[in-house]
Amino acid sequence: MLQKHRWVPVKLVDRKSISDDTRAYTFQLPDDKPDLGLGTCQHVQLGFHLKDRMLIRSYTPTKPLLPNAPGQNSSNGNDKSVRDGSGTFELTVKTYFPTDAQPGGAMSNILDCMPIGEEIEIRGPTGEIVYNGNGSFTISGKEYTFNKINLVLGGSGITPGFSLIARALLDSDDKTQIRAVDANKSEKDILLKDELDRFEKDSEGRLKVTHVLSHSNDEWKGTKGHVDADLIKASLFEPGERTGVFLCGPPGMIQKAALPALRDWGFKEDENVFGF
């Protein structure tokens, strides 16, 4: 259904509050288009017409999580709810409300206030990384296979990593092992935590997620601090022939902390380190 160079209208049909500032938005595709047709880890662009310009933002859907391929095996009992072909897709978006210090997130506030039944436009896919399942990736047109996958994610950068995790763990034929670092300010900022916890619990050891908080309260029993070399080495798979790393998060965290630590450990950009 998606087209890279043509905007297509979709209708907002549901908005569900997940936390004080996070919503799950369900959009309905045009009547004759049941499939979104997005590759795992890819993004859609949302476009909203302002008076003098078009506001555009990219998001990775949190549904569908599996391609429309009825012959594939799934380890999930609610297969239809996560598989493409329903005529809808879901975005999980954190709303950055305006304050005295900053104007807030333009698109997230538009979505938060948009009436149910109103239309917005989408196009895509964007993103050069596609997870094909069972460790196979197509990255900028080149094929890669990784048996072990490391993810370094921050804030809303969790969403492409979540789509990869879901695809790998919902497919009963996929044997890929995944280690993830998910960095946030506080516990309430962790997107999709319940879903990640459920995937980890049901993974039989294939998935391990390390949440690290920079502004945790006394009740937080997990990892505290920032992403650094020690955390990366303690939480992720070490460099190896079939080990890849995928990154998505704030530029400061990625450029100043994660990438230097990964390089020093022995990983190489565009060989086994990639950004969503």
Q: What would you call each of these model-derived segments?
A:
Residues 2-118, 184-186, 214-215:
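Ferredoxin-reductase
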Residues 52-60, 127-136:
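Short, Lys/Arg- and Gly-enriched loop/turn segments at beta-strand edges
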Residues 146, 169-178:
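Conserved S-adenosyl-L-methionine
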Residues 148-152, 246:
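Conserved beta-strand elements of the Class I
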Residues 156-161, 254:
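Hydrophobic/small residue at the entry helix of a nucleotide-binding pocket
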Residues 160-172:
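Histidine-anchored nucleotide/phosphate-binding helix
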Residues 176-276:
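Reductase modules of NAD(P)H-dependent flavoproteins
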